[in-house]
């Protein structure tokens, strides 16, 4: 898709947000990386009706006002009824994007997913994975977790990187 092709243009050389109150030249990453961050957020919200009401609500509620990024984050948190503060901190204030680290441990026919986020402290973004025809959410944190996946063909395992702007690393 158009959004995912933008990944090729991101250098991850600087955070999206620059240093305030100084003349700070940002990276061109801010455009593509910002677009990919919003694509990730839309998939985390996982409700297009809510997503588009948030986008329209930002326009309607903040017209004729001077706002900053925190005003927008607070609004998204309020309307979505979820706290995305750590998500925004990771994507806006740090040059590196979260890395999903994982391994699949085989025990006979059964397989166990061992996984975590390599990201800022308390980063706990849910993630969709796919086995065969089925997508399901997992809930990584900064600490390793294990999930029994049962028996399946290892070639059917897929991390939905088309929906999230992340790096992955198989350990």
Placement of each model-derived feature along the sequence:
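Hydrophobic alpha-helical and helix-loop surface patches within well-folded domains
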Residues: 1-118
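Edge beta-strands of extracellular beta-sandwich domains
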Residues: 162-171
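Beta-strand-rich binding/interaction modules
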Residues: 84-85, 100, 104-161
């Amino acid at each position: 898709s158009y959004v995912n092709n933008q990944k090729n243009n991101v250098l991850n050389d600087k955070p999206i947000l620059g240093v305030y109150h100084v003349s700070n030249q940002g990276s061109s990453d801010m455009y593509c990386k910002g677009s990919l961050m919003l694509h990730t957020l839309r998939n985390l919200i996982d409700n297009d009706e809510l997503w588009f009401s948030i986008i329209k609500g930002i326009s309607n509620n903040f017209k004729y006002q001077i706002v900053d990024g925190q005003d927008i984050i607070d609004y998204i948190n309020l309307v979505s009824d979820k706290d995305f503060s750590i998500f925004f901190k990771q994507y806006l204030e740090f040059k590196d994007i979260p890395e999903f680290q994982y391994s699949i441990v085989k025990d006979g026919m059964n397989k166990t997913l061992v996984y975590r986020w390599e990201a800022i402290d308390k980063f706990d973004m849910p993630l969709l994975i796919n086995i065969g025809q089925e997508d399901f959410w997992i809930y990584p944190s900064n600490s390793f977790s294990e999930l029994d996946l049962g028996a399946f063909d290892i070639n059917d395992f897929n991390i939905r990187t088309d929906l999230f702007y992340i790096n992955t690393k198989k350990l």
